[in-house]
Amino acid sequence: MADSDKHGDEGPSTGVVVKAKPKTKKPSMYKVLMLNDDYTPMEFVVHVLERFFNKNREEATRIMLHVHRRGVGVCGVFTYEVAETKVTQVMDFARQHQHPLQCTLEKD
């Protein structure tokens, strides 16, 4: 046998081409927070939670009571765009009904 055959250094090389998968970063998440006030009726807050956050009556009532007792509560966690939209929707809806209800967002 020739030396080149022993070492396998000569001739065409074969290999596998591996495509690098791009690393996709998960989007940052934001909490939509509802703030307590002394003027917005509890039933209105429950309605907002059901309408804009798809909460059932029991869960909406639980969140409303948490906001009432602690001053602030989480309505949900969303991507920035969704959280921002929900805050705007809630604030606009509250103003239309002449309630001072406040919502804000905070990075999770």
Swiss-Prot record:
Naturally occurring in which organism (per UniProt): Rhodospirillum centenum (strain ATCC 51521 / SW)
Gene symbol of the encoding locus: clpS
Protein's UniProt name: ATP-dependent Clp protease adapter protein ClpS
Cited function: Involved in the modulation of the specificity of the ClpAP-mediated ATP-dependent protein degradation.
Region (Disordered): 1-21
Compositionally biased intervals (Basic and acidic residues): 1-10
SUPFAM superfamilies from the UniProt entry: ClpS-like
InterPro entries: ClpS (IPR022935), ClpS_core (IPR003769), Ribosomal_bL12_C/ClpS-like (IPR014719)
Subunit structure: Binds to the N-terminal domain of the chaperone ClpA.
UniProt record similarity statement: Belongs to the ClpS family.
A biological process from GO: protein catabolic process
